[in-house]
Amino acid sequence: ILAQAIACQASPHAPELFPRSYTMSSQKPGLEKRLSATGDDSINQLGGSFKGNSMRHGTAPAKTAKANDPGCFSCFASVPVKDVDVVCIGAGIMSATVGLMIKELEPKWKIVMYERLHAPAEESSNGFNNAGTGHSGFMEPNYTKEVKNPDGTLKTVTTEKVEHVCEQFLSSRLFWDYCVKKGHLPDPSTFIHQTNHIALGIGKDQVEFIKKRYEAMKAKDLFKSMEIALPEDKTKQAQWAPLICAGRDPNQPICMTKIVHGTDVDFGALCKAKVNAFMKLGGDLRLFTLVTNIKRDGTAWIVTSKNTSTGRGVAKVRAKFVFVGAGGWALLMLQKAGIPQVKGYMALPVTGDWAVCQNPEVVARHHVKVYAPGAPGAPPMSMPHLDYRTIGGKEVLLFGPFGSMTFKFLRYGSNLDALKAVKCHNLCSTIGALSRNMGLAVMLMKDVFKSGSGKLADIRHYYPEADAEDWTLIPAGVRAQIIKKDPKTGKGMLQFGTEVVTNDDGTICGLLGASPGASTCVTIALDTITKCFKDKPQFKAWAPKIAQMIPGWTAEGPAGDLSGINCDSIYASTGATLKITPK
């Protein structure tokens, strides 16, 4: 059950979007019911229903484990250490994908997945804790780089990064297509929907950027279906995005591009479905289980854990391979493992809030996702966008995020997370990166202290007729951005993106960073498997199986590289299977 915003409103500590003069008491009847998104939660029926807690300063919902619940450690009572093949730390979209893929490749392997909370997908994979976009670069301006003339005018836009991002998401579509056909995933309409992606430019400078971006991207096969609505195309713009155009000053120039192959993804529902498939194939999910230590034991790793429900019951397993998909806590786990490859790494946690609208009359007029350029130097998470979302089967609009700062690496983490991660080897990198990104800190602090009327003005910049009574704030999750040494200068740098870190022999691997995150989960899984198992004897037998899962994949090429395959055929075949063919 996803009840993020209801808990947020009910809490005396919940952030208010608007001043008291904008009363929320006049919200239409049925609002609470519409926001409670009940889904098919077959995974957690053993322990009953669960609720996501949206209070930023709250803790994970408490729940008492029964003796036979997934959090039970009785199976370890007779032996101090149990041998397994693979341990996945965390039950988010990354571990779910890696666990399911390896289980498909090696059905007889013993794979254990540890989750410290009461259910999978309660952190960044939760529908309200991420953008819910199938990031393909169709509309996200941060994936295209501006090239300017000496006088400062815009010359052109580069497309290398946006092509790579698009190919990565196509890999995800191919794997989900495979899983649906194999019966691993349920009806695709429970987790993915076709949604037009629109890039928006408001004002002269942004209009010029969108036009140049269109010219550069339209020439590429991946984006040849892109359409443009110039400032003079008022009728077309109103058809594409009615909320954006209604009530807008006719003298204000706007420009839009649209691609119909865009998607909205409920990564929370998708993650639970993958974990469910993992369990049906024989995978072992352990809820209420906190990993407290990772220690080398010859060619394997001893993973120590405890029951978070009772606070008792220490258990140990010896794993041949460990995947750390613990979100922001992946850094802390890799530090516990003591691998030298993680030295110099630190994380900058960035959080924020969504403004959410559930008024069905408003939602019905905006079945699109709209992104626009953000402030210079802004992190990907803070790029403002107005999105149609389907979360747990419920339709809502989300705007934002409004950025903020935190010391937690996870939404249900600890305020000591950042302090625990500071080590002698990453102190200089941290200081250097922060000193070079003071503008980011200033931008986040401005959002922190922005008034309700200021946030309403931001919404109205996109949706001029926005009514304050239709909107409220909910937390937007936490993104732990990477801090590391710049390989060129040796100074600390802030890196937006994700990075797979492995030790020398490929026996432990962790994922650091954030955006584009969940959209690239399949590419990350492929990268993990290739880096860690390519020199292992079983990889030769795996390669044709992986190529069957993701047509176009080769062991020699980089993970997610689909440059040698016809993208039209991918859009058509996966669109039909996943029920996201453009209407």
Predicted regions and their residues:
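N-terminal Rossmann-like FAD-binding beta1-loop-alpha1 element of flavoenzymes
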Residues: 84-112
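C-terminal catalytic lobe of FAD-dependent flavoproteins
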Residues: 255-258, 269, 409-538
